[in-house]
Amino acid sequence: MAKSKRFPVMGNIEEKKCLNAKACPLAISHESNRDCLIMNVREPEITSVTDLTDKELTLRWKSIDWKRVKEAVNNLQSRIASAAKNGNWKTVNKLSRLLTRSFYAKLLSVRKVTTNKGSRTPGIDGVIWSSSADKMRAALQLTNKGYRAKPLTRKYIRKKSGKLRPLSIPTMFDRAMQTLHSLVLGAIESAAGDKTSFGFKPYRSTKDAYAYLHLCLSKKVSPEWIVEGDIKACFDEISHN
């Protein structure tokens, strides 16, 4: 049986070129040349994002095969988690750098921040990525080189009690950068983190917490009392210095 052709996505740490440069659907220079983005259209080689018109950027964004992008990112995340589980931190560092420099991961990060509930809320710079061209341009410009996070925008929303709850809103670029690095941190945490922590974690719910509590409290030597408490305005009052 003949083997199918495969493009080197992020499977190898060493630098490799596309197996068939002419057939590469997106030959565009960005921070890392490790990725050959699988799209549904063939494009000429572009040296910079400034060489692309909004129409060309829109075409590229709308032609992305998101299934392949997710598979590539998930594959590298699995390798990071496996290395973290085995305590191979040198490999974790190498793979983490690959992931944060990967164009696939950048595309996915931009997509996440532009499809969540806060995508229409700008940061201090007043910028939102609403068009396909904006999103593609953002992915091409997402880099750690010279990066400095901008100040947060402070806004308040009214709670059911009538009190105001403060919100600190980062810029779209900062949100995308946070999402990009969370792809690495999430993979490491899934393997090396606290297995009995259930709050604000993907694929875990209150039902998982209930099941663990039942397991802990159903033994003969289990505690007989549970004290529940609430620290008023905990995150606002706690010292961050």
Task: Give residue spans per PLM region.
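Glycine/proline-rich, flexible active-site/cofactor-binding loop segments
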Residues: 35-47, 165-195
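Active-site-proximal segment of RNA-dependent polymerases
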Residues: 60, 184-237
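Reverse-transcriptase-like RNA-dependent polymerase core
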Residues: 110-113, 138-163, 172, 176-185, ...
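Hydrophobic (often cysteine-bearing) scaffold residues that line and stabilize catalytic clefts
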Residues: 72, 88, 169, 173-177, ...
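Switch/connector loops and helix/strand junctions flanking conserved nucleotide-binding motifs
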Residues: 122, 237-238
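Short, conserved non-catalytic motifs in the polymerase core
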Residues: 117-130, 149-176, 192-205, 227-228
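Generic, well-ordered alpha-helical scaffold segments in large soluble proteins
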Residues: 79, 83, 98, 179-188, ...
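Non-catalytic, polymerase-adjacent accessory regions of viral genome-replication enzymes
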Residues: 1-136
